[in-house]
Amino acid sequence: GEGVDSNRVGERILVRSMQNSSASKNSWAMQTIGSEFDGGFAQFCVAKSNESFPVNCDWSDIELASIPISYSTAEGMLCRADIQKEKILITGASGGVGSAAIQLAKLRGATIIAQCSPDKASALKELGAEHTVNRHDDLIQVLGMNSVDAVVDLVGGKSWPHLLEILKPGGRYVVSGAIAGPIVDLDLRNLYLKDLTLYGSTVNDPYVFENVIRYIEEGQIKPLVSQSFPLQDIKKAQNVFMEKKFI
């Protein structure tokens, strides 16, 4: 389009799904493909040049399409909470973001405990989780109080208070999902007496997406595509997705 460097024509690119809003001076303002502007579930999409990142790899288009939301969300969470070589818990670990977080946290040298259903435990260990915890188990009983350095949460829900109980003093908690429920109970004493830090994570700096592309090009992560559908079967694809029978 007009204003785009002609040298970029023919590039293979990935487009950030969540983008900084050019209509706002607020650096935290964002817009999402398929929400604030058209392009989700579409054959073609108009994208800004500065939100289109070149990628050089032998992955298929379908494999690359699995990356922008799940892996950038996961990498953004890990960057926000500064995950390092430490013991962490990932909730909702068998979902798209959770399984991406396992691979990305492994690159950082973290020891990973993945919370999931029993039938998905072995697959998550193959991705890099050292241990798995049944999502229905009591985390305090299984892991113990003050047992992990950080929690990467995609679930929320009624068991949320246990996530702060298992954090060590000075621990960090980062969240970017609430599939089990967005309303939780917080005992402020756990927060201030243990000197915990809580992070929300949605808007990412461009370097987060650049990190993900570098991991792809260096062969450090692998795509997880369980099934693909033609665009006209999008309703069927969504129904299969909601069955949650795959990683």
Each PLM stretch: what is its role?
Residues 1-22, 58-59:
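Glycine-rich beta-strand-centered segment in the early N-terminal region that forms part
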Residues 12, 87, 111, 171-172, ...:
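Short glycine-centered segments of the SAM/dcSAM-binding site in methyltransferase folds
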Residues 14, 149-152, 174:
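N-terminal Rossmann-like NAD(P) cofactor-binding module of classical short-chain dehydrogenase/reductase
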Residues 29-30, 158-224:
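Glycine-rich phosphate-binding loop and adjacent beta-alpha segment
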Residues 36-41, 57-80, 94, 100, ...:
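A glycine-rich, Thr/Ser-enriched phosphate-binding loop motif common to dinucleotide/cofactor-binding enzymes
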Residues 76, 206-247:
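C-terminal hydrophobic helical "lid"/dimerization subdomain
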Residues 88-92, 176:
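Conserved N-terminal Rossmann-fold NAD(P)-binding element of oxidoreductases
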Residues 90-91, 106-161:
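Adenosine-nucleotide cofactor-binding segment
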